[in-house]
Amino acid sequence: MQVIETLAEGLKREIKVVIPAKDMQDKMNERLADVKDKVRINGFRPGKVPAAHLKKVYGKSIMAELVNEIVREQPSAILSSRGEKSATQPEIAMTEDKDEADKILAAEQDFEFTLSYEVLPPIELKSVKGIKVTREVIDISDDEVTEQVLKVAESARAYETKTGKAANGDRITMDYLGKVDGEAFEGGTDQGAELVLGSGRFIPGFEDQLVGVKAGDEKTITVTFPADYPAKNLAGKEATFDVSVKDVAAPGAVEINDELASKLGIESADRLKEIVRGQIESQYGSLTRQKLKRQILDQLDEMYKFETPTSLVDAEYNGIWSQVNNDLAQSGKTFEDEETTEEKAREEYKTLAERRVRLGLVLSEIGEKAGVEVTEDEMQRAIYDQLRQYPGQEKQILEFFRSQPGAAASIRAPIFEEKVIDHLLTEIDVTDKKVTKEELLAEEEGEAKAETKKAAPKKKAAAKAEAADAGEGEEAAAPKKKAAPKKKAADESAE
């Protein structure tokens, strides 16, 4: 077998592989000898079929098997012998001419094919001792815990039907039909809808006009959708809602006690407070971790500048761009609404894709050198977490992970990345800094605003932008969730 390099430009490689017809003939004869005593052909005793007849009957099918085996097995062997790793699966090209193909299968012509691929760039790791980051630390006060527990209590409070007029804080149960220009519109109708007056859940003006209604009342409400309402067909439009009030209920007292905890399935009020404190710590910890990670990745980005495989960048960019367009379509907005243009947005996301690929390769190299591994238990827990997100689809999800090799990689990549970050935190200079809740959130909001000005509408998963959330190359798409119930048009939470 001859292996001839025909292209070596940057990271691009093209290899021509030639297997002489005689070698193919020899391999075929070996296979024919193996099957000689096993096949049954009319007119011949077992093991007595002439070689020429065997070749005539089975030659082409055996050669086709050999060709498939060579194409399946040799690319990885060739790359290994060259000391190369391909960024993606090599592209394989062979003759499409029928006459040439027939000659190859008849062992009358050399079998040739071409491998085209990009190699992963060599990365010489640098010392991370110079990386300095600040870890923001927050002390969670008892008052903040109590405030959150009160919100839990309010959401779990009981309501009791009353006969009087509805006031702010009361919960009404209603049917409604929304119309624009006299025509009903999608999402504008509901039955048995519950609304706490004064909650601000519905569009401005809707709740105010229900103050004073009683059970059994019929009322037509006129409101105007906000100019920035996500559904462009409704934004700025005047609408009427025919409302039929079914029930008015007054709120019960909000008390933090063991009875409340029991209602929530928790043993005591003290335990409820512990759980809420843990949730707050987790939320702040997640935000602190994200900002800490961003600092590390920003500095790694400055340290490493090298050519990235176009195939990986294109795959990353296409994933981001697809999500960006989906987000725009769902929100009914355009690039102009986001104070940018499609051209500028493409440039921004191309840069983001390059950064993510480059950082992914760097983190991969750091992790490999440090011996970072994702354990089977960690993979199983991650897959279980995925199953919990798709109730009723557990079997399909498990089958997806079994049948799609890339699916497991998509689960492994973020776990591996976080473990590499954990490793780096033991190697770099980390300074803890106490901050208030307001300082932490104010800084985060400031960063978000700055991001919005310089980039196009953000992809929720991909546009961690400067955080880079660097994945390891192309990841398999996860199974889609079942669509969530649509928000009603009057409901402000739809925004």
UniProtKB/Swiss-Prot annotation:
Protein name: Trigger factor
Region spans: Disordered: 78-97, 441-495
Domain notes: Consists of 3 domains; the N-terminus binds the ribosome, the middle domain has PPIase activity, while the C-terminus has intrinsic chaperone activity on its own.
Single Gene Ontology MF annotation: peptidyl-prolyl cis-trans isomerase activity
Organism: Rhizobium leguminosarum bv. trifolii (strain WSM2304)
Keywords, alphabetical: Cell cycle, Cell division, Chaperone, Cytoplasm, Isomerase, Rotamase
EC code(s) of this entry: 5.2.1.8
Keyword Cell membrane: no
